[in-house]
Amino acid sequence: MTLQNVTVIIPAHNRPERLRRLLDYYSRTDIKVLVPDSSDHPFADAEKYPDITYLHRPKLHFLLKLKEVLPMISTPYVLYCADDDFAVPSGIAQMTAFLDEHPDYSTAQGHYLTFTPHKGKISFYP
């Protein structure tokens, strides 16, 4: 499965451990990744992800971060993903296939699953 037709935007702000986890995840795919980061300090591991475009813009407002990266998108599809979410590649592929097959649609959204760890157990709910 190829996802070269997708760019994911991951706006980040002062949660480097979550950003690292998500970049580790997406670095195993061929999805293009843009990270506008308004954190106080630059993400220390940014250089470990050479295929990911990382922009450190301290204290930049959320909408201005998006405005800066939108012109960088060169793919037909864009996915917004917060740094504490995961969009799984199979779901992304299903959404792009749906949009390819239904040109009268401009957006698609998958299912969300939330989990909460508590006392050694994990609860899942939609």
Summary of predicted features, one role per range:
Residues 92-124:
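Conserved donor NDP-sugar-binding/catalytic core segment of glycosyltransferases
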Residues 82-86:
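The conserved acidic donor/metal-binding loop of glycosyltransferases
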